[in-house]
């Protein structure tokens, strides 16, 4: 070996690049790369000690039976402590007794046998069905304590680490976790899922004794459509199905989302706006300035939308309908929210700060409204110039 062969960069590869994910079905195999690998291989997302490293992590598209294989042309001849044992590292995050390593034939035989005896979800667990591009899809809601779901979730949960930033595994023994599963109706291929948790909702001291049954806050935790199915509307269908299911559940008083990223915020905003538009909400806004807090509170509870989200939606609707109340409503909220930071500033500086925040927010609201279908409808709300 030459001196160059001992340079660290010769033996280092991006773990995002090395890890190849595959969904295998009878007619094809779709390969794609993870977005994140730092939960498994560290913050640098690099693996040292192997040349031409390829990590194959494949799943049957129906059962999601996992298969793992690690290939490389040579291994660094140094201390074993310096090297990551890739097989052992990945098996920490996979169902160890359920994952087939290297023996591809055994893996294929295993998932084919499992497909023959696979047990369908119960009819009462089916909460929705929809069609995209002439293909039918179905959504099921299943408690994580269901043995079939618990085994399936152990197989798919690694995708939360690989595609959801800052995700971690949930406590599978907590009976309050529920899983919303999307799959193709014909051949039962897995499309995506969301984990959800019902938190007890404290109604306040005045109402606590009068409540006849427990009420809950429904929380969407992890939400993922697998990459091969992204960009086709599955996320909106899944989100709307969860919301519809919870709005029809009298025990759920409010719907919240745990640490949403920007793309999920957009999906949520657009679908909440579309839902409110279809319900005729845009024509029901009071004309008072400011809009009464009592009306805001009673209306958001009717739709089971959390306070911050409802405020955003209300402001976007005011902008969309050209209401002169838009600027007043937004600036009043910003003034209250930033009261401590604005204290002691000159009046002119406060106005400048509010105007800057207002314009930035309006620009973002315009961006979101532009994604809504009603913005392009001939009889949809027409945006007018807001007087400033």
From Swiss-Prot:
Residues 142-306 form the N-acetyltransferase domain. Keywords: Acyltransferase, Chromatin regulator, Cytoplasm, DNA damage, DNA repair, Nucleus, Transferase. Its main location: cytoplasm. GO terms for biological process: double-strand break repair; subtelomeric heterochromatin formation. The active site is at 258 (proton donor/acceptor). Signal peptide: none annotated. It is found in: Cytoplasm; Nucleus. GO terms for cellular component: chromosome, telomeric region; cytoplasm; histone acetyltransferase complex; nucleus. Component of the HAT-B complex composed of at least HAT1 and HAT2. The HAT-B complex binds to histone H4 tail. This is Histone acetyltransferase type B catalytic subunit.
């Amino acid at each position: 070996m030459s001196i160059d062969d001992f340079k660290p960069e010769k033996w280092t590869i991006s773990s995002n690049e090395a890890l190849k994910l595959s969904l295998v079905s009878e007619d094809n195999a779709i390969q794609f790369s993870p977005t994140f690998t730092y939960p498994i291989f560290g913050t640098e997302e690099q693996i040292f000690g192997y040349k031409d490293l390829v990590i194959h992590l494949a799943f049957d598209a129906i059962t999601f039976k996992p298969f793992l294989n690690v290939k490389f042309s040579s291994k660094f001849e140094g201390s074993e402590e310096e090297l990551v044992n890739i097989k052992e590292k990945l098996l920490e995050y996979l169902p160890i007794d359920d994952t087939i390593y290297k023996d591809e034939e055994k893996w294929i035989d295993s998932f084919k046998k499992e497909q023959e005896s696979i047990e369908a979800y119960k009819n009462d667990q089916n909460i929705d069905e929809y069609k995209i591009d002439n293909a039918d899809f179905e959504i099921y809601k299943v408690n994580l304590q269901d043995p079939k779901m618990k085994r399936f979730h152990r197989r798919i949960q690694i995708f939360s680490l690989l595609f959801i930033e800052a995700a971690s595994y949930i406590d599978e023994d907590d009976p309050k976790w529920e899983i919303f599963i999307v799959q193709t109706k014909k051949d039962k291929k897995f499309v995506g899922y969301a984990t959800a948790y019902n938190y007890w909702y404290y109604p306040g001291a005045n109402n606590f004794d009068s409540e006849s049954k427990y009420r809950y806050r429904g929380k969407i935790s992890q939400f993922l459509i697998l990459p091969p199915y992204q960009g086709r509307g599955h996320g909106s269908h899944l989100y709307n199905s969860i919301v519809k299911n919870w709005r029809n559940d009298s025990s759920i008083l409010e719907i919240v989302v745990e640490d949403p990223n920007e793309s999920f915020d957009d999906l949520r905003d657009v679908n909440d706006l579309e839902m409110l538009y279809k319900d005729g909400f845009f024509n029901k806004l009071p004309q008072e300035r400011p809009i009464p807090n009592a009306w805001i509170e009673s209306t958001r509870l009717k739709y089971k939308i959390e306070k911050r989200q409802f405020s955003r939606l209300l402001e976007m609707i005011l902008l969309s309908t050209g209401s002169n109340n838009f600027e007043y409503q937004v600036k009043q909220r910003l003034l209250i929210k930033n009261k401590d930071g604005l204290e002691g500033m000159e009046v002119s500086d406060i106005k400048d700060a509010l105007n800057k925040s207002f314009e930035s927010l309006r620009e973002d609201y315009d961006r979101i409204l532009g994604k809504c279908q009603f913005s392009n409808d001939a009889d949809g709300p027409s945006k007018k110039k807001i007087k400033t």
